[in-house]
């Protein structure tokens, strides 16, 4: 029996495997054999390591050599939304219920952390090194990775990483109503707008529920309407419906951009937006606009297509301002021109927010109408009013209520009428419009 520590055992095992079974490290088809080789080496050497049985040691050494070290068990967890590596010795888990927990284990050293993250990024063909210290990638199974290393972060930090685990799930109106994110009336209004040709943008910060809301709205679209989705790196929109025989029931085209350091292999969201228009879509859904694809999304909407998307911004005017700034990256038309186009392209802005009690709320729905002279008129249609914030025994409690502030404008109601909204349905939302406008 040999008493040692994990890292000494790892070093010796790696040397042994590299010398006698090197191909097993690089050939995925031989990974089962690799584990057997590791097990034999461990048993032959009689390693004794505190806190590990022989089986646990074999699994950990295997994870260190071909998987992702301490991150491996968390990457497949269904109750974890994010893994944040602040530095090699500081790893924080964010659970689906909002809890943030620091892991007891951490990487062995700054270099160890960098090596594991390089392995993570390898799956999407991305490289991180001193020349390119910022990288974004993904893992199979809808996991997004953003990493930064020195010289962007301190040398003794090693590397900082945000890993977001995207869990496929069918979200519908009932889920959002039951969670308190929106009311039935709000969901019905938004579903009507998307179904009958009103482009909208869902704004908010990270983890505010933007994509969850978008999934629910698109899931309400009739199966005969064609939806074309565009996302970056990892899938967040899950819209394909199958019957019990596995047959597809609706009409969806899912696409993913392919970021690459090699320009010849790079496929941007902007290119996919342009391609979408050749697929005769009823709705184009851009998971998130964050760069020059904003201009293509605006143009697609202005040419009569229904476009729905999300953006990191504040509510109403702030969302249009953000979209206009992104459009400027493609064509410098002048901020006023880009702003006017963004407003016309997306007459509805839905603002989602994550509250301190970890609940998500549709805080505001605003409509903008651009008059012939170019003047923009904003009106709040719905909002969530917070009436009480309470912090007690380490927990936040937030109370409030949803309010219908104004009916849609006559301009929006006319668009919906022309698009075929049944009068009975439209009347639920446009009742009182003349009285409101008279005020």
Regions found by a protein language model. Give the residues of each.
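Switch/coupling sub-region of P-loop NTPases
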Residues: 198-200, 216-343, 353
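NTP-binding/hydrolysis catalytic cores, primarily Walker-type P-loop NTPases
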Residues: 361-439
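Conserved lysine of the Walker
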Residues: 210
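Phosphate-binding/switch region of NTP-binding enzymes
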Residues: 340-373
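P-loop NTP-binding catalytic core
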Residues: 90, 94-196
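Hydrophobic anchor at the beta1->P-loop junction of P-loop NTPases
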Residues: 202-204
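N-terminal accessory targeting/assembly segments
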Residues: 1-128
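Walker A (P-loop) phosphate-binding loop of P-loop NTPases
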Residues: 207
């Amino acid at each position: 029996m040999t008493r040692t520590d994990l890292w000494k055992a790892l070093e010796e095992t790696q040397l042994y495997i590299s010398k006698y079974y090197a191909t097993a490290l690089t050939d995925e088809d031989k990974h089962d054999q690799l584990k057997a080789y590791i097990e034999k080496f461990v048993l032959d050497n009689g390693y004794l390591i505190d806190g590990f049985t022989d089986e646990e040691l074999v699994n950990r050494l295997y994870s260190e050599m071909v998987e992702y070290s301490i991150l491996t068990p968390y990457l497949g967890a269904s109750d974890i939304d994010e893994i944040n590596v602040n530095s090699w010795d500081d790893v924080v888990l964010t659970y689906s219920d909002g809890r943030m927990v620091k892991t007891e284990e951490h990487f062995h050293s700054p270099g160890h952390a960098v090596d594991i993250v390089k392995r993570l990024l390898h799956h999407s063909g991305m490289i991180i090194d001193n020349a390119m210290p910022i990288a974004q990638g993904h893992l199979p199974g809808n996991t997004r990775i953003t990493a930064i290393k020195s010289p962007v972060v301190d040398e003794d930090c090693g590397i900082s990483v945000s890993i977001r685990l995207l869990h496929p799930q069918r979200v519908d109106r009932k889920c959002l109503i039951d969670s308190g994110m929106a009311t039935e009336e709000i969901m019905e209004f938004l579903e009507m707008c998307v179904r009958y040709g009103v482009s909208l943008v869902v704004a908010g910060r990270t983890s505010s529920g933007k994509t969850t809301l978008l999934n629910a709205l698109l899931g309400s679209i009739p199966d005969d309407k064609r939806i074309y989705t565009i996302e970056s790196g990892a899938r967040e929109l899950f819209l394909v419906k199958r019957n019990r025989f596995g047959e597809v029931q609706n009409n969806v085209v899912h696409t993913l951009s392919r970021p690459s350091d090699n320009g010849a292999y790079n496929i941007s969201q902007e290119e996919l937006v342009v391609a979408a228009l050749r697929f005769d879509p009823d709705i184009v859904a851009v998971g998130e606009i964050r760069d020059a694809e904003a201009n293509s999304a605006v143009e697609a909407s202005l040419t009569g297509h229904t476009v729905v998307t999300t953006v990191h911004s504040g509510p109403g005017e702030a969302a249009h301002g953000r979209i206009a700034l992104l459009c400027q990256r493609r064509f410098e038309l002048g901020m006023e021109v880009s702003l006017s186009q963004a407003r016309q392209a997306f007459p509805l802005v839905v603002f989602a927010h994550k509250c301190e009690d970890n609940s998500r709320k549709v805080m505001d729905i605003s409509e903008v109408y651009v008059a012939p002279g170019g003047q923009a008129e904003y009106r709040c249609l719905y909002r969530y009013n917070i009436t009480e914030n309470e912090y007690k025994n380490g927990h936040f409690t937030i109370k409030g209520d949803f309010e219908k502030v104004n009916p849609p404008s006559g301009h929006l109601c006319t668009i919906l009428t022309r698009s075929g909204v049944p009068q009975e349905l439209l009347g639920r939302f446009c009742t009182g419009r003349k009285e409101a406008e008279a005020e």
